[in-house]
Regions:
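N-terminal secretion-targeting helices of virulence/extracellular proteins
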Residues: 1-86
Length: 86
């Protein structure tokens, strides 16, 4: 495999790792919001039955999803640039 191919594969693996980390954060935020809703509605106590901070946690999810989208766009653009250079 040519050196530039090795570099491209390495860069792609790094991007995949970034996407996985962002999605893990989005998952954690979503699970936290679900816990607040369950607690606030009389379900099991999920750490914040009062609902305090629910809006702040809910506000994080769109930002995390936007981060995923931006990373995917960046990856696609880099792949396009690489393929055009072959």
């Amino acid at each position: 495999m040519r050196e530039e191919h090795v570099g491209a594969v390495h860069a792609a693996k790094e991007k995949i790792g970034e996407i996985q980390a962002i999605l893990a954060g989005a998952t954690d935020a979503a699970e936290e919001m679900i816990g607040v809703v369950v607690g606030a509605t009389g379900g099991e106590n999920c750490g914040d039955p009062s609902g305090r901070g629910a809006f702040e946690r809910a506000a994080r999810v769109p930002d995390l999803i936007n981060d995923v989208y931006a990373t995917l766009v960046e990856t696609v653009n880099e792949l396009d640039a690489y393929l055009l250079g072959i």
